[in-house]
């Protein structure tokens, strides 16, 4: 598509950023809706982040997604921060407005939307969240807001204890994760375990409650060992790519004025891009 002088511009800021599938995702939506706009990968080093964000706003960009390592630094450049970002402790979506920069975090809402797309009610029962990083924080607080009782479990207990204290959540030791499955309706892996090039997550799904939903936010590979084991036992498996797609919806709507749909065609397009 040839852009006009009125094209809307957005992008994803990271360092590095070449691995991001967000340009493929947003590009598909732009083409689908015939929008005069573009979504660009923007490799910006940490020392240049604040100055570059200010420059993008002055250049007329509508906004940007923010990924590693900038999610915490994005707080400092915002004039207004949504409660989702405040509770998650990180910003992943910037919207440039005439009155300043607005920051939000869509990881939690994207995770919940992906659960519901798989027929899982986030408030159906207690949820066990493995991990205590930024994604765990966003997902745990979103589940809590949706009505679930949330239990945290992390390899390094200090972060999980702090997060549990901040939001009134339950914390259990890492060694108790498999035994705890029987008491939960949902388990979520927010760690890097199971990601390509990392060790698999060791979790004994034989101890899972019948009908348990097993979610993994890892999307490379699309089918992690955890999800494969869940499917083999007849449990509900919720893959990470869907979360990536759903969390992108609010930003696209804010920047380009159209609320896009996450459907099978979009999933296949981004999945094909992931598999090269």
Swiss-Prot record:
Pathway: Metabolic intermediate biosynthesis; chorismate biosynthesis; chorismate from D-erythrose 4-phosphate and phosphoenolpyruvate: step 4/7. Gene3D superfamilies: Leucine Dehydrogenase, chain A, domain 1, NAD(P)-binding Rossmann-like Domain. Its EC number is 1.1.1.25. The keyword Cell membrane does not apply. GO terms for cellular component: cytosol. It is an enzyme of class 1 (oxidoreductase). Shikimate binds at residues 20-22, 67, 92, 107, 219. GO terms for biological process: amino acid biosynthetic process; aromatic amino acid family biosynthetic process; chorismate biosynthetic process; shikimate metabolic process. NADP(+) binds at residues 83, 131-135, 217, 240. InterPro entries: Aminoacid_DH-like_N_sf, NAD(P)-bd_dom_sf, Shikimate_DH, Shikimate_DH-bd_N, Shikimate_DH_fam, Shikm_DH/Glu-tRNA_Rdtase. Involved in the biosynthesis of the chorismate, which leads to the biosynthesis of aromatic amino acids. Catalyzes the reversible NADPH linked reduction of 3-dehydroshikimate (DHSA) to yield shikimate (SA). Belongs to the shikimate dehydrogenase family. Homodimer. This is Shikimate dehydrogenase (NADP(+)). The gene is aroE.
């Amino acid at each position: 598509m040839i852009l006009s002088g009125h094209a809307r511009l957005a992008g994803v800021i990271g360092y590095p950023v070449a691995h991001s599938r967000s340009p493929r995702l947003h590009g598909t939506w732009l083409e689908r809706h015939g929008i005069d706009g573009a979504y660009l990968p923007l490799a910006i080093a940490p020392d240049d982040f604040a100055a570059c964000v200010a420059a993008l706003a002055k250049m007329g960009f509508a906004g940007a997604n923010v990924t590693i390592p900038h999610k915490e630094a994005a707080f400092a450049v915002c004039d207004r921060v949504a409660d989702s970002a405040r509770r998650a402790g990180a910003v992943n979506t910037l919207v440039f407005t005439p009155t300043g920069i607005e920051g939000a975090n869509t990881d939690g809402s994207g995770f919940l939307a992906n659960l519901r797309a798989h027929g899982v009610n986030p408030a159906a029962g207690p949820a066990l969240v493995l991990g205590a990083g930024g994604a765990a924080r966003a997902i745990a607080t979103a589940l809590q807001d949706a009505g679930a009782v949330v239990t945290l479990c992390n390899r390094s207990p200090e972060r999980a204890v702090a997060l549990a204290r901040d939001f009134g959540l339950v914390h259990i030791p890492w060694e108790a994760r498999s035994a705890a499955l029987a008491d939960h309706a949902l388990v979520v892996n927010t760690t890097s375990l199971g990601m390509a090039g990392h060790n698999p997550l060791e979790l004994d799904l034989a101890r899972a409650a019948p009908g348990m939903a097993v979610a993994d936010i890892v999307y490379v590979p699309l089918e992690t060992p955890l999800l494969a084991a869940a499917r083999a036992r007849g449990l509900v498996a919720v893959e990470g790519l869907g979360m990536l797609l759903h969390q992108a919806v609010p930003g696209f709507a804010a920047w380009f004025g159209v609320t896009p749909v996450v459907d099978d065609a979009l999933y296949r397009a981004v999945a094909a891009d992931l598999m090269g």
